[in-house]
Amino acid sequence: MIKSDPDVEVYALGKHIRMSAHKARRVIDQIRGRPYEETLMILELMPYRACYPILKLVYSAAANASHNMGFNETALIISQAEVNEGTITKKLKPRARGRSFAIKRPTCHITIVLQDISKDKKYFIWLRKYGWIYKDKYTDVRERYLYMMDHMLYRNRMTWINREMIWPYRDSEVLWDKK
């Protein structure tokens, strides 16, 4: 069950979507934790059939955020996304010699939760590879500074030269000495 903070989170729920939960999870795992605009680009370019209903749900959640809560769409991220199995529709297909085969049509329930990071105080500014980093983890200014330097190294904005981290185009300016 997804618990949401009503001040900064908005969700959209799609029930009885006619596809396998396994196939929908393949797409949901690609968009979880990403910004709203990047999610739209990913969903429009992925070649899976599951992308279209998920794209409609993301649009619906963004419309809920802008209309009901007044959030700006550029500050939204997909904070939570989950896929649950729904009911299975069973039909009988007639076959030769009076027999029949069962046809199972699975459904799934998809929940998309968008979060406005401009109004949320818990999230740290910099985005890392594995998701958003909580601000509570860093207690003093030095730890935040070290994390910012690590982030700049990760994004290839800084390089290591002789155990010192410097800007790529300014060889004389040393920011931090690694000891």
Curated annotation (Swiss-Prot):
One of its GO terms (molecular function) is structural constituent of ribosome. Keywords: Chloroplast, Plastid, Ribonucleoprotein, Ribosomal protein, RNA-binding, rRNA-binding. Pfam families: Ribosomal_L22 (PF00237). One of its GO terms (cellular component) is chloroplast. CDD domains: Ribosomal_L22 (cd00336). It is found in: Plastid, Chloroplast. GO terms for biological process: translation. InterPro entries: Ribosomal_uL22, Ribosomal_uL22_bac/chlpt-type, Ribosomal_uL22_bac/org-type, Ribosomal_uL22_CS, Ribosomal_uL22_sf. It comes from the Eukaryota. The keyword Ribosomal protein applies. Its main location: plastid. Gene3D superfamilies: Ribosomal protein L22/L17 (3.90.470.10). Part of the 50S ribosomal subunit. Belongs to the universal ribosomal protein uL22 family. This protein binds specifically to 23S rRNA. The globular domain of the protein is located near the polypeptide exit tunnel on the outside of the subunit, while an extended beta-hairpin is found that lines the wall of the exit tunnel in the center of the 70S ribosome. This is Large ribosomal subunit protein uL22c. It comes from Ranunculus macranthus (Large buttercup). The gene is rpl22.
